[in-house]
Amino acid sequence: MDEHYRVLALRVPSEQHPPPVATLMARRRVRVLQSILDDVVGRAALHTFDGTSGVVLLPGGPHQHAEQVTAATAQRFDTAVFVADGGEAARADLPAAGRAATELAELARALGRPAGSYRLDDLLLEYQLTRPGRARDRLAERIAPLSTRPHLLAALDAYLRHGTDRKTAAAEVHVHPNTFSYRMRRIAELTGLDPADPAGTRVLAAALTVVRAG
């Protein structure tokens, strides 16, 4: 083995297929990935990809190898693919680097981000919010009353993604602006956090991230 490797984690979304079909598709992706690695870096690359998720180790070399592998998987896989680029790691640090990259790829998928390549800098806040601890647990508790009210969660998600623009968010969830304003008031009543208040918005955004990440 080399002393240093570039660490990539791959994750594809779960799909509803009969088990035999899912197995065939997974095996095909493994073969495609091996072909990509052979073309880009040769036999020196290592991976644990099983057709759904796994880690790829690229030996020290041109940095564009990682970009080439990412682009090729996006083009040749039969589904969306999330790639987390964990950067270079020494051989002794590979297990930890692989776990961190795997968590990052899964986080991007769980949060509904577009398929593509992610680095830690792309999800710094979201990654930190999902670290275990009392604050994360409390954030989940604050938004728990919305868990049985998916229409309120959808309204909150749209509201936050559109920069608190109620008119645009209301159009996305297909309700009248007055109905949307009522939903915002219900969120405030149920959580004790007012979406119209900047401080409340920040906490609600953090809590929603925790819930989406599972």
Give the location of each predicted region.
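Cytosolic nucleotide-utilizing catalytic cores of signal-transduction proteins
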Residues: 1-214
